Amino acid sequence: MGRVYFRWFSIAVVMFAQLAWARFARAADTAEAELRQSVQELERWLGNDVQAPGWRKFLKTDQLNAELGKGARADRGLVREVLDRFASNAPGLERRRFVAVRSALKKWLDTLPAWRAEQLPEMARAAKPHLVLVTESDVKRERARLDAAVDKLRQLLSEAKQEQAASWKEAVKWAQLESELAAAGAQPDLKTLLAIEELYRQDIAGLEQDEFVAVRQALDKYVCTALFASSAEPKKVYEGFLDELAERFPSYAQNPQAEDAIFIGKRLGWLDRFGQARELVAAARSSHSRPNLFLEVSEALMQAGIDQNVDETAAVNEVILGTRIRGNARLTGAVTLDLVPSQDNAAINILLDGSTVSNSVGYNGPVRVFSRGVTSVNAVKRLQLDDTGLSDRRATARCSTRTRIGRVEAGHLVRHIATKRIQKTKPQAEAIASRRAAGRIAGNVDDRSADLVQDANASFSDKFRLPLVRRGGFPQLLQFRTTDDALQVTMLQAGRDQLAAPNAPPALTGKFDLAVRMHESLVGNMSQAVLGGVTLTDVRLVEMIKELTGKPPEGLGDDPWSITFQSELPIEARFTARTAKITIRGKRFTREDQEIRRPVEISAVYTIEKLPDRARLVRQGDVQIDFPGRQKLSTTDIAMKSFMKKKFEVLFKPEIVSEGLTLPKRWASIGKLKLELLVCDKGWLALGWLKPPAPAATETLVASSR
């Protein structure tokens, strides 16, 4: 029997593979056919126009047709070069037929076989003859884009309130930028523009607006283009970097090391910054820069903070079929959370199931009708979470009302007529009551969830999204998904000069209520986006630690001091076999009126132990304070080093013990989550927690007397 099952399983796998390949092949054929058609339409449109030869030469249409003839064996690098021409900012390329080719070209490139990691060295060497020279016209084009972006920002500033506009102008040195750009016939000082561009990355409210971001990006592009155009030996530097990458790729693929990741990331960043070897850059990042954070939260844990019983009383006062109804209604039921499988975003249903019991009196002329109604209530509120925040749909509700008529008060004859009329109109009245109840319930759910959605979005935007957008460090990938029983988050954090994770995370061995898998690259990359170049005072550090732990650290803020972080890798983590090394890098340190302006590194190494009831980190040796590049220290250096060691030993304690994880606010009542998984190796730190068992249900005794 086992052989039969195995045979059918094998057949199913083969059939699935064939169907998947057939689907991919059809997609490739469709993309190629679409590209051929759009190229033919472009050729017919160009025809014998006087500018047609220039367009064909610039867009490399002959090379494109040659690669189309190769089908799936087309050279991705050459196709990428053609795509770059169609995607450039050359005037006229916004016309419909050029746009059609560009769109089809992108689709076709996506269907071509991707480069493998072992092909990267060969690819780097093959890119050496393809240096893209930057001309003066390229510099002028980027300057025009910068001027246009500045004009739009100028308009925004003119429309803003005077006090706010003045604050923004001062923060980004607006007057200095205008002065640099106003110099007629002279190129602005590129170092000055580069310094101004950094100011647009400050965490100041408002700098996330499109107009500020556009100026920041245009400044970066213009400065990079102008620098490359004025470079004395761009070919030598370009070929040297490609040779270095070809040498480093194999060792990094076999045994990824953080030093190699930093080296490769910087070289790829240089190529990307100056628009060189785009296909190599894309292929290298695809192979060696993968998501570096995976988060999973179980439905059961989410329900522990959301699910609740409902017991509410409200007055009834409405008119149904001409009868004024007054009384009270009591809603009892339960609010529960239900995850909906979704690959595009996190889909969450908030469900309300219960019933409403009402006791009311209906008034219609001389008649009074006493009744009791029971309404079943089922309401659904859909929430969706993606990289822009939390959104919601209007709640829907289904209600069904059944009434039981009690006594009818009126004169004898009138009561008889009223009773017959009540029985006749009862189904219609119940239908009206059901519809109105559904509308009220849905409206109440929407009203109550409005503050929840608004607060969640404010927290997400103010504490995460907007600060990173302002500093140009929002994750390249932030994906939310839901399954039947878990919410999953996948994130890739890497800047232009950085790599993320080189490999997949360790597998989760079991089911957890909360699981985090973090690559060491996340610490360095995220810290650069958040803390690069930032000055942190002792007061602010104490506040941050208090926010995280609930209590202030002792001895950290006794004497006034501050540290200004390095712009690159201000904090770095290394995760090896049950060992974690944390390094803090600064470029300026102050103590009261004393100051040193030189690189300093503060580091500590911990061994990590998973014990049955807790996790323990034990520091190996002392906290290390180093001044890179300095062999001899001055008296001031020695005194400052001693002071720093004293302060950071408070932060890097000899032993750190965690007996569980306490969640905030609504989840605090469930108790501490117990750490069940701890893996620290090969650059990854994996943690998994389980919530404590729910307390045993207590029996409710009902007493009655006779």
Residue ranges of each PLM-predicted region?
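Amphipathic, rod-like alpha-helical scaffolds used for oligomerization/assembly
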Residues: 374-376, 380-389, 394, 421-424, ...
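Interfacial loop/beta elements and low-complexity acidic/Ser/Thr-rich segments
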Residues: 278-344, 361, 677
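Bacterial N-terminal signal peptides that target proteins for export
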Residues: 2-10
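Extended, low-charge, aliphatic-rich alpha-helical segments
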Residues: 29-305, 417-620, 627-706
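Boundary at the C-terminal end of the N-terminal hydrophobic targeting segment
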Residues: 22-28
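Short acidic, glycine/tyrosine-flanked loop/strand segments centered on an H-E-D-like triad
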Residues: 389-422
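N-terminal beta-strand/beta-hairpin edge segment
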Residues: 335-390, 561, 569-605
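Bacterial N-terminal signal peptides
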Residues: 10-18
